């Protein structure tokens, strides 16, 4: 990681900790800044690793019995915007030069009405792969929120898609990003639809699909991170517009800022860690983690320590 990004990450996390300690913008009975810090760190780690951020953002309050987010959906949506804005900042900062290069290439291909370089092709595939999940997210969000996301469902999805990742990662690495095809882009884009379900993981399912299609581990991870930019940017705008129209819920400013800073800081480290790891290793540790997490969920429910719903 570039030194300036490392320093920026450290400063952002330290600022979040100081704000949480000062309880800035906190309201009695609402989500505390310390809880927001924990969820921001969770988001930064799990959004960018193939282990499902949406699942962990449900499981952490479930384990801690934090009922406030469940009982206040308006606050929850506002806080969710802040967390995703944080990880968006992390990805844009880390891949800034790649993003600028791809945008310039995409604009150039529009002007010439043709595709003549690898960058232009990758830029178009990122755009194509974004469309299916964006449509489902825009029109199916309420259905997903109402019917999916219970801990017992998360345990199933963590297991099922963890096994799929393990199988996919055994496929030969035959392509880099330059070897992407139109069919690959569409296939990875369609797979993103499944990521709306907590426990699947957006990065996990796109990496899984990429590996099934022959992408190398590093290429699959990089393409997954690039896909995060437009889909998360669109989600932040879409949800942010709703929040702006309804107004900020009381007590949301402090947790919003703390969570966003923590997610951005930890997200930068998570990107560097994953890319460095998969250059030398496979995705098996993440598969093992998913299976262990699912087993713990089932054990907690079976023992009566926690309810199967939240």
Predicted segments with their positions:
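Multi-pass membrane proteins that catalyze or facilitate reactions on polyprenyl-/lipid-phosphate substrates
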Residues: 1-310
């Amino acid at each position: 990681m570039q030194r300036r990004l490392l320093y920026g990450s450290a400063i952002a996390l330290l600022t979040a900790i100081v704000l949480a300690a000062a309880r800035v913008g906190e309201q009695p009975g609402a989500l505390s800044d310390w809880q927001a810090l924990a969820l921001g760190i969770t988001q930064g780690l799990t959004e960018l690793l193939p282990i499902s951020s949406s699942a962990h953002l449900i499981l952490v309050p479930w384990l801690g019995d934090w009922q406030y987010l469940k009982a206040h959906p308006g606050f929850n949506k506002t806080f969710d915007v802040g967390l995703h804005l944080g990880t968006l900042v992390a990805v844009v900062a880390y891949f800034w030069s790649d993003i600028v290069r791809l945008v310039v290439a995409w604009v150039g291909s529009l002007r010439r009405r043709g595709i003549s370089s690898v960058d232009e092709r990758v830029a178009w595939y990122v755009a194509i792969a974004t469309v299916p999940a964006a449509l489902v997210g825009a029109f199916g969000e309420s259905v997903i929120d109402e019917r999916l996301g219970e801990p017992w469902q998360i345990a199933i999805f963590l297991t099922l898609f963890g096994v799929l990742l393990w199988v996919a990662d055994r496929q030969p690495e035959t392509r880099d990003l330059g070897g992407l095809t139109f069919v690959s882009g569409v296939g990875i884009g369609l797979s993103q639809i499944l990521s709306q379900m907590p426990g699947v993981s957006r990065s996990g399912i796109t990496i899984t699909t990429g590996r099934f299609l022959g992408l190398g581990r590093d290429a699959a991870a990089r393409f997954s991170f690039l896909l995060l930019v437009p889909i998360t940017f669109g989600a932040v705008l879409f949800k942010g517009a709703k929040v702006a129209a309804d107004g900020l819920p009381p007590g949301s400013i402090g947790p919003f800022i703390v969570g966003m800073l923590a997610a951005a800081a930890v997200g930068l480290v998570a990107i560097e860690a994953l890319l460095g790891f998969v250059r030398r290793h496979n995705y098996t540790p993440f598969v093992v983690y998913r299976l262990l997490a699912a087993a713990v969920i089932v054990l907690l429910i079976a023992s009566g320590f926690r309810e199967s719903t939240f």
